[in-house]
Amino acid sequence: MLEKEEIVSPNLEELKSHYHSIITLLGEDAGREGLLKTPERVAKAMLSLTKGYHMDPHEVLRSAKFQEEYSQMVIVKDIDFFSLCEHHMLPFYGKAHVAYIPNGYITGLSKIARVVDIFSHRLQVQERMTLQIKDCIQETLNPLGVMVVVEAKHMCMQMRGVEKQNSITTTSDFTGAFNQAKTREEFMNLIQHGRV
């Protein structure tokens, strides 16, 4: 999980002004008691929800890259995340499951979760986020293979449009050893049935 420090941005005042205008354009009184601080709250929330733009996920992995001869699958599963759909700026949220097969180097397990957090704290589409997580791990650790599966619920499908409240979207991407169906099957079995 990303640190919860206060977000400081030179754009805060301008964002507040725009959110004040949006509230007014929606037909509300931006000056009434319940909405007085809303522009500032929303501006700070948006800066927090998109702070991944100001973080380097490759550096996160490099900061805990260790030489190790372990060469079997490493899986970090059930990584909770939330993000904002870039089309409607509504949340989507779910779990990411990440596996890699080391090739002389491993990384701290928490760093995998941080990579997911960094890419999810941006305006996103689930498909691209899945690809970015995979590419970041592949490029930084150069493992024998990487596989990422992301399962999410999208508020843009639940609250508006088709209004399908129970739909779940699953995306996956993989490299190297995971091109073999047997290796992918092992990963899928472990994330579905391998509970502690």
Curated annotation (Swiss-Prot):
Pathway: Cofactor biosynthesis; 7,8-dihydroneopterin triphosphate biosynthesis; 7,8-dihydroneopterin triphosphate from GTP: step 1/1. This is GTP cyclohydrolase 1. The gene is folE. PANTHER family: GTP CYCLOHYDROLASE 1, GTP CYCLOHYDROLASE I. Pfam families: GTP_cyclohydroI (PF01227). Keywords: GTP-binding, Hydrolase, Metal-binding, Nucleotide-binding, One-carbon metabolism, Zinc. Its EC number is 3.5.4.16. Belongs to the GTP cyclohydrolase I family. SUPFAM superfamilies: Tetrahydrobiopterin biosynthesis enzymes-like. GO terms for biological process: one-carbon metabolic process; tetrahydrobiopterin biosynthetic process; tetrahydrofolate biosynthetic process. Zn(2+) binds at C85, H88, C156. It is an enzyme of class 3 (hydrolase).
